[in-house]
C-alpha cells in the first residue's frame, strides 16, 4: 500500500541517520557501513563501482550494486535501498521520467550526453559497416531489456522503443543479451559507452544512422539521488569514479 511504502521510506531514512551516528562515534567493533547503487544495464556503471570498491577494505563495508529495471532504479533510491541510481533521459522520455523523479522526491544530475549506437557481435553481418541505418537492421532481432508487464515505453532503456519491430527478444540481464547477440545475430541500441574489460572484446558499438522517421536521439546519462540529500563519502567517490571513467572512455565512443 502507499502508506506501507511511505513508512518503509521513513524507516530507512531514520535507520540511515542512525548508521551515520554509529559510523561517526563508534570505535572498533564489527559494524559494517553500507553503500548501494542501482543502475540501468550499463557496464560502465559496474566498472566505476569496481574501481571505487577497490579503494576500501571490504571487510568494513557491505557493498551492493543492482542492475535492474528503470522503475526499480527509481524506487530503490527513493526508499534508500540505494544511495545512487544511474539512468538516462532523452527527448522522448524526459518529461515522463522527470515527473516520476519529482513525485519520488529525487533529482537528476547530469554526467554526459551521447548519441545512440548499434551494439552487436563482431561477426554480425553488419559488423564492418561505418554506420548502420534502421532499414539495415530490419531483418535482425531487436534486443531490449525487460521492464515489467505494466511498464510504459518511457521506461525503456533503448531509443525508438515505440517502433514496430518484426522480431524482438527481451532479456533481463546483460550476460543473456550478449549471448543472444551471438546466437541470434541480434542487436540493441545503446549509449556506445561499453566497458570491454567486463563485456569482452567480441562486441562492437557502431554509430546508428538516423533518418526522418527514425531519428538518432541524444541520450543524457546521469545519476539520481534523494532531493536535498548529502552524498556519503562512498557516494561521492562512486560519482567521481563514474565521471573519471566517462571522461577517459568516451572519446572513441562518441
Mark where each language-model region is:
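Basic, amphipathic "hinge/linker" alpha-helix immediately C-terminal to the N-terminal HTH DNA-binding motif
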Residues: 1-17
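Short beta-strand-centered segments that line the small-molecule binding cleft or hinge
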Residues: 9, 50-55, 71-115, 120
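N-terminal winged-helix
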Residues: 16, 23, 28-76, 232-235
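Flexible hinge/capping segments at coil-to-helix
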Residues: 29, 100-142
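Secondary-structure junction motif
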Residues: 45-51, 94, 133-163, 192, ...
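Hydrophobic hinge/microswitch elements
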Residues: 69, 78-83, 147-204
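Beta-alpha-beta core module
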Residues: 102-109, 114, 175-228
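A bilobed periplasmic-binding-protein/Venus flytrap-type ligand-binding module shared by bacterial periplasmic
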Residues: 119-127, 220-231
Amino acid at each position: 500500500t502507499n502508506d506501507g511504502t511511505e513508512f518503509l521510506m521513513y524507516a530507512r531514512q531514520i535507520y540511515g541517520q542512525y548508521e551515520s551516528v554509529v559510523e561517526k562515534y563508534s570505535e572498533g567493533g564489527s559494524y559494517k557501513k553500507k553503500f548501494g547503487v542501482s543502475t540501468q544495464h550499463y557496464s560502465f556503471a559496474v566498472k566505476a563501482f569496481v574501481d571505487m570498491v577497490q579503494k576500501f577494505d571490504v571487510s568494513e563495508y557491505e557493498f551492493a550494486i543492482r542492475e535492474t529495471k528503470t522503475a526499480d532504479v527509481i524506487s530503490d533510491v527513493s526508499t534508500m535501498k540505494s544511495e545512487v541510481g544511474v539512468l538516462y533521459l532523452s527527448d522522448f522520455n524526459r518529461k515522463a521520467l522527470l515527473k516520476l523523479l519529482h513525485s519520488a522526491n529525487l533529482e537528476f544530475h547530469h554526467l554526459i550526453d551521447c548519441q545512440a549506437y548499434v551494439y552487436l557481435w563482431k561477426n554480425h553481418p553488419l559488423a564492418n559497416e561505418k554506420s548502420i541505418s534502421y532499414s539495415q537492421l530490419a531483418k535482425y532481432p531487436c534486443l531490449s531489456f525487460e521492464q515489467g508487464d505494466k511498464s510504459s515505453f518511457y521506461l525503456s532503456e533503448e531509443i525508438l522503443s515505440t517502433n514496430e519491430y518484426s522480431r524482438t527478444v527481451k532479456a533481463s540481464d546483460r550476460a543473456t543479451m550478449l549471448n543472444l547477440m551471438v546466437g541470434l545475430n541480434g542487436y540493441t541500441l545503446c549509449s556506445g559507452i561499453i566497458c570491454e574489460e567486463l563485456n569482452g572484446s567480441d562486441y562492437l558499438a557502431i554509430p546508428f544512422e538516423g533518418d526522418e522517421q527514425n531519428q538518432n536521439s541524444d541520450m543524457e546519462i546521469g545519476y539520481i539521488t534523494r532531493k536535498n540529500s548529502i552524498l556519503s563519502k562512498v557516494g561521492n567517490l562512486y560519482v567521481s569514479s563514474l565521471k573519471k571513467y566517462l571522461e577517459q572512455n568516451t572519446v572513441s565512443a562518441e
